[in-house]
Amino acid sequence: MNAIANLAATPCADLGECLADLAVDALIDEAELSPKPALVDRRGNGAHADLHLGLMQASALSLWPCFKEMADAAQRHGRIDARLRGVLGQLGRDGEAAMLRTTEGVNTHRGAIWALGLLVAAAALEPRRTQAGEVAARAGRIALLDDPAAAIGDSHGERVRRRYGVGGAREEARLGFPRAVRHGLPQLWRSREGGAGEQNARLDALLAIMSVLDDTCVLHRAGRVGLAVMQDGARAVLAAGGSASLAGRRRLCELDRRLLALNASPGGAADLLAACLFLDRLPAVSGGWAGSL
C-alpha cells in the first residue's frame, strides 16, 4: 500500500480526514500498480500522450480537500436527499477545478471524483456500516438523485454513452457499482486467497472489471472493436491463471500490446479499481474512527 497514512494501524481522530486519506491512497495505489494494460503506471504513459505517473500522483493529492469536504457534508447532513446531492455536486465541481489547476488542464481523475466522491459520502453517512455492498448501495441511492445545477453533459463519456447505448459511469454508480462489488472485489479476494501477491491480486481485480465493463474510455478511442479486444483479452489473462502465472503474464503482455496499437486505454476500469481498493480497506480501518463518533 502507498501510505499517505498507515490507516489500518493508526487511529483516526476525524472521520472526514480518514475517508479522504483512504480515497487518495486508493487513487495513488491504482496509478502506481504495474504492469497495467495501456494505462499510466510505473513503466510509462500507456496510451496517454498527456499523462505520466507524477501527474497522476499530484492530481490525486489535490483531491484530498474535496473528499474531506464531501465526507464532512454527508456526516453533517445525515440523510440522502436532493439537498445533499446538490452539495456533493458542487463540491465535486470544485474538486475538478482544483484538479485541473494542478494538472494545467489535463483530465486525470474526473471519473474518479464521481465514483470515490459518492463512496466517501456514503461511508460518512453510516460510518459503522462499512461492508462493501452496503456502502456501494448507499452511494447508488445518492447517484439516483439528479443534481439540478449540473451542466448538460457533452463529455466524451456522455457522447459515447449516447452513441453506443451503454450506461457509462453514471449508470454504474446508480446501480451501486456492480462491476466493482460483484467482479473486482471477489477477484481481488480470490487471488489473495490463492496465494497471489498483493500487486497481482490487484491486477487480477482490474482484469475482472475490464472483462465485463463497457468502458466508455475504450469505446471513445477504439469503438466496439477496441472494447472486444479489452474484454476478451482480460478474460484470457484470467483464464490462463491470472497475472501471477507465466501463461497469464504472457496474455497480459499481449493485451497491453493490442490496446496500445489501438490507442485504447481502459480508464473507466481504472476508476473502478480505485473504488475497489477504497471499499476493500474500509472495514479494516473503520475501528480507528469509532472513538470520534
Curated annotation (Swiss-Prot):
One of its GO terms (molecular function) is ATP binding. Keywords: ATP-binding, Nucleotide-binding, Transferase. GO terms for biological process: prosthetic group biosynthetic process. Its EC number is 2.4.2.52. It catalyses: 3'-dephospho-CoA + ATP = 2'-(5''-triphospho-alpha-D-ribosyl)-3'-dephospho-CoA + adenine. Transmembrane segments: none annotated. Belongs to the CitG/MdcB family. Involved in the formation of 2-(5''-phosphoribosyl)-3'-dephosphocoenzyme-A, the prosthetic group of the acyl-carrier protein of the malonate decarboxylase. This is Probable 2-(5''-triphosphoribosyl)-3'-dephosphocoenzyme-A synthase. The gene is mdcB.
